[in-house]
Amino acid sequence: MKDFTDTISESECDDEISIVPQVELTVPKTDDPTSPTVTFRMWVLGITACVLLSFLNQFFWYRTNPLTISSVSAQIAVVPIGHLMAKVLPTRRFFEGTRWSFTMNPGPFSTKEHVLITVFANSGSGAVYATHILSAVKLYYKRRLDFLPALLVMITTQVLGFGWAGLYRKHLVEPGEMWWPSNLVQVSLFRALHEKENKSKWGISRNQFFVITLITSFSYYLLPGYLFTVLTTVSWLCWISPKSILVNQLGSGSAGLGIGSFGLDWSTIASYLGSPLASPFFASANIAAGFFLVMYVITPLCYYLDLYNAKTFPIYSGKLFVASGKEYKVTSIIDANFRLDRQAYAETGPVHMSTFFAVTYGLGFATLSASIFHVLIFNGKDLWTQTRGAFGKNKKMDIHTKIMKRNYKEVPLWWFLSIFAVNLAVIVFICIYYKTQIQLPWWGAFLACLIAIFFTPLVGVIMATTNQAPGLNIITEYIIGYAYPERPVANICFKTYGYISMSQSLTFLSDLKLGTYMKIPPRTMFMAQVVGTLVAVIAYAGTAWWLMAEIPNLCDTNLLPPGSQWTCPSDRVFFDASVIWGLVGPRRMFGDLGEYSNINWFFVGGAIAPALVYLASRLFPNKKWISDIHIPVLIGATAIMPPASAVNFTSWLVMAFVFGHFVFKYRREWWQRYNYVLSGGMDAGTGFMSVLLFLALQRSEIAIDWWGNSGEGCPVAKCPTAKGVVVHGCPVF
């Protein structure tokens, strides 16, 4: 294609070697500045992809298996549409002779148009984290939160990161040492989709394979999505003895250990861990080891030793309980000002968690410290060299950055700072004008910004060189939980501003590096990022608000009909976190007044574990597998449980092992050609059928009542086993 063969005139660009070997092997050192970028096709396909992915991902977010449809689906799907538009759209110019002159069809569909469309799609595929705030307040706390402040919070949390991206782009994008490994997958896919495709021995192109996969997965999802929902979670062990609590605990894929449980549903497989087809085998192996260690060693051991009164509660649950084993009525300990009612809390008693939930919180602590120490121990020397090269006065400019600076105008820093200033002003306005609904004081917004400013370059260097990014959610919850306790909405707003603004800035920086690799004009990339983010936020907010009005008892598992998919597991965990860190506070949970203070030792364990692996690799250099142990991945594997359950892991691991090991090893050519295309087709087909089923049948409550839609068949998996505990629907020992 023209984009990859028309080189700039300076011969040194062909001779200069990229600092990172992977970049040298993957990214072309060529550019065609005349290639179409901002076109009618780009706007139509980009905004359509952004809105569609935003709607689908928010739609799935409230479901039991919240499938995330990645931008890869759109990245592949728009190729034939783009080529079709290049053939059929008129080529005449509109408003010719004016500054607004444009043509709907500037020629062949270009790679640069495709990259910008994918940037729009990235905005739609990345969840708007602040929708959790809307769900927690309106659906769980049953309190008032108007649409305007909710929308403003969503917009500001998503866009605030532009400020940090502008401040640190010189250090985290321009240097060759900052190579952002995940972008190389995107670059490879762009090249595969645009460079001339030789006929394969299977007689089918990537686009044809994508269409076949999409139609097949679309048709198949009619079974697990409507006609035969038991395929979502097949827990056959429970069928042997459905009234035995022990058998139910062992066999339930949704509320137990999930031994032998599996799902024949793509949304079950890919909902929490992402597509198993995109996971490297070493990462899948670490996830498998972590899952088996936590689920089949630590959890049974803690439960049957009755640690933290484990038998009084379900073996697996993300809910909160009182000491007697009944579900905690959080609304009963909130006063009229939406703060903790201390007297009511003293009468109700402390908040209790299932031991599994407590352990996974500990694993979250450990993952944070392990991520930092793993990178320092295993990548410290290279990291220091790369950081000095990036932040030093004599930093060497990357060859691709040289090409960009030669051919295109930079984005002025004041563009980024203007967005930051406007955002900060809006945030202060929200904090003051909507104080009773948001609770966050203005100084809390500034503190959240300071945390994000401090951690963005640190985490950014780690992410740009190792593809690992420790989250800030626990740190932010801890800080505001002590600084401004007993205010749940303030806690989750602070967490979102501190954590998500940093996370978003890393996304923006990653996209800027992708633009450098693919030679997208920086100002055009900036425009696509800003517009895509705003469109995505509006689409996410509108979809969430519509679903709240459309679905009766959304997220309320006590009132939803049996087998309902609208259980909102992710929002439930977010709500519980707001209770633990915000309403009750870390001091009453993990501090000197809390029952779970020993969980803090996980911070220490997470810091020590990478050092032990490093020592083992030095003591036994011939054991190559030791160096493949990645502690943050291993112990962080189950940090998403809950809301993820055992069946999500067992099903995912099987698929990851098949495609990441067997197919990759023994059918490498097929894997290279079709693996990511298969993943994108499965995402898209499942997503489209799910929405169609809802609009055509489930919205009108048209259901089929038969045993295939009666759930997994583990009715007592959530029952306690302690003596004398009375829970509705459970036997008393």
Curated annotation (Swiss-Prot):
This is Oligopeptide transporter 8. PANTHER family: ISP4 LIKE PROTEIN (PTHR22601). It comes from Arabidopsis thaliana (Mouse-ear cress). Belongs to the oligopeptide OPT transporter (TC 2.A.67.1) family. Coiled coil: none annotated. GO terms for molecular function: oligopeptide transmembrane transporter activity. GO terms for biological process: pollen sperm cell differentiation; protein transport. May be involved in the translocation of tetra- and pentapeptides across the cellular membrane in an energy-dependent manner. The keyword Mitochondrion does not apply.
